Amino acid sequence: MQTHSHAITFGADAWSILSDIELSIKNKIEAAGTPLKDWDVDIYRGVLTGYNDAFIISSEKREEILGNCADESEKQRTAAIIRPILRGRDIKRYGYVFAEQYLIATFPAKQYDIDDYPALKDYLLAIGIERLEQTGEEHIINGERVKARKRTNNKWFETQDSISYWDEFSKPKIVWAELSRTGNSFAYSDDGAMVLNTCYILSFNDNEFHEKELNTLLGFLNSKVALFYLDIISSKLDETGWRWLKQFVELIPVPVQLIFKEDGQLTNKDSASINAQLYEQLGLSPDEAEYLDHII
């Protein structure tokens, strides 16, 4: 049997050579699906602090800061901006492990007055304004060279990125790490957890509650079909690592009409069952289904 290969271009930075069977699978996915970028969803990168050693704290440090508050009012204000944070390593397929890490969420977009948070201010001052300021300058302190965060217009106590989309973290959402050694590692979050800049979040761009839709989409994103498509449109980190960057994830065609049928919900978290449903819905041949089961 003669095997053909086809060079496929996906953009300036992504191209792939596909076999006949890979091209057939790709075409069936695209025929049935709508790219995520054309959905009513938003995808955002997680929070870039510019200095995680200061802005990411343990539960013990959080309790210490709250314990140093002068009164209950200050304590409540301060607790409200010390938020649970997920790192890439914390996010697994269909879930995550909260490692008791917290983010000091002083986002520039929120325009906080640090003097309203004396205990938090004291904690940050102890680290040093010279290290936290966003000037890009270098200082010599006690004979040690200290490099400030990169130059921005933000204040010394604020995160490096403005995070104008801060309210998206409070919505029900899908979260994932940019780098993955296990293929697909998407999880559902409805507890208001934030994520670091090595992760992404996806939420619907309205104020409706979309738990069912998000969990169905989650099943698809954790499927062999989604992993296959990412594999052919992006450059892998290495032989066993994938990069789930926004620019690639938003290109994945999601078969909206198929996966949201009442009798076709992909919410049982059973990978084999979800893959089998998708193979049938996409009209994959037995050879194509077997190919996805064994090649990815």
For every predicted segment, state its role.
Residues 248-282:
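Extended amphipathic alpha-helical segments enriched in small hydrophobics
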Residues 1:
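A conserved non-catalytic segment of reverse transcriptases
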Residues 276-296:
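Conserved AMP-binding
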